[in-house]
Design a protein with these regions (language model features):
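Glycine-rich flexible loops
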Residues: 1-238
Length: 238
């Protein structure tokens, strides 16, 4: 069942290791088949070097395990909540990459300080609130998804304009049209978090530093890559 999608999800998960976004068995990637109402996700706690495409677990969008000999990722309810809240999302990645986690642990949005960030997201990457004790001791992973969705909705942000949210004291979740785009966004997020950290470090030692991107420059860079009249890259005909 969903053999092609399982292969894609497997390959996307292996990219987490290739890009050094995870260590040990941390992290997970999933992808959804909207027509069939199913999604595929990495199994829980399986070493990347021992994992195969056949190990990927098929879940329904109502939360039932449909196929797989292994348990799905413990973060499955988070992925499920995001797929159900945002139909435009086709793939989700969760990592514990160092720089993104540092910002999450600090409970800070990642400001847009330059055009690299603007090419990725149309504004600051939000850091969602921490979960309450009741939320943690209840359906923790499901509530994590609800907190992410709450953050986007409360700020009036489209998930495709801001393809990442940090969860306070936890880490980053990213998404995209497919699992490979979700992983790409996780990689870009790690880089912009690193750049933002270094920018603030430099600025702390120089009172004349001028940090923060102008709105018109941010908008230009975002729209030329992602807007209706985007002209970055090659057309589909090329």
């Amino acid at each position: 069942m969903l053999e092609e999608l399982k292969q894609k999800v497997y390959e996307a998960n292996m990219q987490l290791k290739e890009y050094e976004l995870v260590v040990l068995t941390w992290g997970n990637v999933s992808a959804v088949d909207r027509k069939k109402g199913l999604f595929v996700i990495k199994p829980s706690g399986v070493p990347y070097d021992k994992m195969t495409a056949d190990d990927m677990v098929v879940m329904s969008l109502t939360g039932e395990k449909i196929e797989g000999k292994l348990n799905p990722s413990s973060d499955t309810p988070t992925h499920l909540e995001l797929y159900n809240r945002f139909p435009e999302i086709g793939g989700i990645a969760h990592t514990h990459s160092s720089w993104a986690c540092a910002w999450a642990q600090a409970g800070r949005d990642v400001p847009a300080y330059g055009t690299t960030h603007a090419d990725f997201a149309n504004g600051a990457v939000p850091c969602a609130r921490g979960l309450t004790e009741v939320e943690v001791n209840g359906e923790y992973e499901l509530n994590t998804g609800k907190v992410i969705a709450e953050e986007l909705e409360s700020r009036g942000i489209s998930p495709l304009e801001r393809p990442a949210v940090l969860v306070h004291r936890h880490g980053p979740f990213t998404w995209g049209k497919d699992p490979f785009k979700a992983v790409e966004n996780a990689l870009i997020l790690e880089e912009v978090c690193k750049m933002a950290s270094r920018t603030e470090r430099i600025a702390a030692f120089d009172k004349d530093s001028d940090i923060g991107i102008e709105e018109y420059l941010l908008e230009k860079h975002y729209q030329r890559k992602h807007g209706k009249n985007a002209y970055y890259g090659q057309s589909e005909e090329n």
